[in-house]
Each structure stands twice: as C-alpha cells, then as structure tokens.
Amino acid sequence: MSRIDATLSALKSEKKTALIPYITAGDPHPDMTVNLMHSLVEQGADMIELGVPFSDPMADGPVIQKAVERALEHNVSLKNVLAYVTEFRKKDAQTPVILMGYLNPIEAMGSDVFAKAAAEAGVDAVLTVDMPPEESEGYFQDLSLAQLDRIFLVSPTTPDGRLNAVSEKGSGFVYYVSLKGVTGSKALDVDDVAQHVGHLREKMSMPVAIGFGIRDGNTAYEMAKLGDAIIVGSALVSLIEQNASEDSAVIQQVLSDKMREFRQAIDKADNE
C-alpha cells in the first residue's frame, strides 16, 4: 500500500478529511522550503503538494504565477525540488509528498530518469498538469514502474470518456477542480460541487480531493463535507507573497495561523 493510500485509508477509518496544503518549491527562498514543509505538517497537513517551478504555468492564477517567478529568480530547478524532498525525508518518513508541475522539465530530465530520482527522493505522486491520461503511455508507465501515484485533474466540464481514462490510469486520488478557471478563483457553488463530486464517485472508486477556491475556514468546512481531501494553495501562497521579505519564522507563523483555520474548520465538519 502506498503512503497516500495508507494515509487516506487511516483517515477514512476515523471519518476524517485530509488537509493538503500547496506551496511552490523555492518560494520565497530556497532555504525556507524544507522548514515550511515541516511546519505545515506540524499544523495539521496530512500530505503536502509541492509545486515545481516552470516558466509557463498555464493552469495557475496570478498568485501562484508570482510564486513561480520568485522561485525562478533563485534558479530553482526540478533537481533542486527533488533535493528538498530528500532533505524533508530525513525527518519525516510518513507524510506523503505530491509534486505538481508541467511536463517540460520532466521531459528535459527524461521521464524514466525523473521517475527513478523522484522515487529515490521520497516523492509519492506526480500531478502533471499538461499531460492528460489519454496521452503518453510511456510516461505514465515510467511513473508506475517507480511506484509513483499518478494524480489527474478533473473539472465540472470533464467528459465521461476522460473520467474513464482517469479512473484507469490514475491512482492515489483524483483532484477535482471545483471552479472553472485558474487556481485562486473565487466563488464556490456548494450544490454544484456536490452534484459533480457525486457523479465522480459513480464513475470511479478513487478518493476525491477538492481544490481551487478554498480560501478560508468557511469554504473548507463546506468542501470537507463533500471530499475525502481538501487542497489549499492560493490562500497560503498569497500569505507567503505578503510576507516574502520577512524571515522564515514570520512566514511559518502566518502560515500556521491560516492552517489552523483550515484544520479547525475541516475537523468541525468531520465531527458533525
């Protein structure tokens, strides 16, 4: 059983929803990334989604695009990101780490080389934004051979044919994009999300993680009633941006306060 499967299975047995924060590797400074990862776990993260900086992050909104720019100013590469995970694993062998990024840096390394290196570093899963499940059998086979879970994005407009492919090729969980548009979009329609998540559960047996548009405790509370996991990104990354010139302790504190808000809201929903 993979670390992701074990984590979600344990939480399900306790009737709890997973909290998965996202940060961009190397933002605001490469020296801070590993400490921020540990801090997120201390504040209730069940898994961590780590963004791999890439110069054309087409699915990301302005908040995460700026985070990517800050990381790229420090020349943070895919190899650096794997090194951060290796460092993180020296103190944390339990918390699953999911890499989220684009195909270009992986292709530059070679997908087979990347898959082996990622597994050796302690990565658990890869979400490749611009690689749909119908394409590149070889790439997904490389990930599978390295025992890396394959995470896919699905949205309210994803056709059933694509959902079937996600069910076949994906593992770990499916990432449901609860809003049309890019990351960091605003208004969530709870009834609409409930309807689409219900349809997802009819089409596949994988756990459902809900992301995009979860900005505060209220939205986390509503989404925790619907998903197996909640992913929060832009709300945290915007705090990093606002405090980018501060030292690591200040950034950890503001993230801790926001994480506590999310964790308490999710726990409240789980206990009702």
From Swiss-Prot:
Keyword Lyase attributed: yes
Reaction catalyzed: (1S,2R)-1-C-(indol-3-yl)glycerol 3-phosphate + L-serine = D-glyceraldehyde 3-phosphate + L-tryptophan + H2O
Pfam families: Trp_syntA
Keywords from the UniProt entry: Amino-acid biosynthesis, Aromatic amino acid biosynthesis, Lyase, Tryptophan biosynthesis
Molecular function terms, GO-annotated: tryptophan synthase activity
Record-linked Gene3D superfamilies: Aldolase class I (3.20.20.70)
Active site as annotated: 49, 60
EC number: 4.2.1.20
InterPro entries: Aldolase_TIM, RibuloseP-bd_barrel, Trp_synthase_alpha_AS, Trp_synthase_suA
Record has Cytoplasm as a keyword: no
CDD domains in the record: Tryptophan_synthase_alpha
Function statement: The alpha subunit is responsible for the aldol cleavage of indoleglycerol phosphate to indole and glyceraldehyde 3-phosphate.
HAMAP family in UniProt: Trp_synth_alpha
Subunit record text: Tetramer of two alpha and two beta chains.
Family stated for the protein in its record: Belongs to the TrpA family.
This protein's name: Tryptophan synthase alpha chain
Organism from which the protein derives: Hydrogenovibrio crunogenus (strain DSM 25203 / XCL-2) (Thiomicrospira crunogena)
Chain's gene name: trpA
